Amino acid sequence: DLRMSRGLGDVYKRQVIIGTPEEIEKYGKGYDISGATIVDPFNDPNKQKYIDKFVELRSKKGVTPEMAKEQMEKDYMYYACLMCKCGDADGAVSGACHSTGNTIRPALQLLKTKPGISSVSGFFLMEVPDCEFGENGLFVFADCAVSPDYDSEKLAEVAKLSSDSFKSFVGKDAKVAMLSFSSYGSAKHDRVTMVADAVKIAKEKYPDITVDGELQLDAALVPEVAALKAPESPVAGKANTLVFPNLEAGNIGYKLVQRLAKAGAYGPVLQGLSMPVNDLSRGCFADDIVGVVAMTAVQAQNA
């Protein structure tokens, strides 16, 4: 739509816009998108290749060539994912006119998750002004956008993916705090146990990351509190990557920091997929699209 045209006018190099000439002319009028490649899903010479790939990937689910063609013409996100799968694109951005589910579903069906990863999560890169914590105010917050239900195994995966994301985007080593309302067993509850178990799994399964918990937020960030609550922790008092115990906490947490601390909140950026696919809010502005496209490019470069 118009916002996408504006956004891509700013980051036009090597961009692909999927749409009919009529759609592009209608919404792109007045914006310089001359550097972008336009792919018409109804008249693309590569279309049969994508139909064949769709059927190859989904034939066990009963997808026929006719069904694949219809789905690709009806939902351009399927077309984008097939371009990625066939090596004709490095990543995809959607969501300005689609729900999160409609963005993620084609990616899960066609691109799948990374080897060893069972689910997709979403993080925000947070930039907090005048902040002494994290990496000079830079943090990764996860999961803030995707999965409402977690167990210890999946939470450990979020820790690994978030650690990798922090390294990719910030260029520094991540210190991952697994958050709870308890620090090192100070409270007893099934939810505390789930987080503590996730820490154990993450340490055993992903020895390359620095992760600890369970930690309360103040113990994760503030050195003086960390010295009291978790003095032996390699993360407490210096965390820069915060993994929340569930989606409610993550979504509320990033919005609190965004609104009350006037922080920049860049995302949600999806992690766990085999190729970069990212979601936009339907209330996004052109600048938001530029940011998410840029972050998708970073993910592709580090894939």
Predicted regions and their residues:
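Terminal amphipathic helices with adjacent charged low-complexity linkers/tails
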Residues: K13-D44
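C-terminal functional extensions of proteins
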Residues: G137-V140, V146-K188, A196-D197, I201, ...
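A C-terminal functional module that forms or caps the active site or interfaces directly
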Residues: A236, N240-L242, N246-A261, A265, ...
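Single conserved hydrophobic/aromatic residue that forms the stacking wall/gate
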Residues: L2-M4, L8-Y12
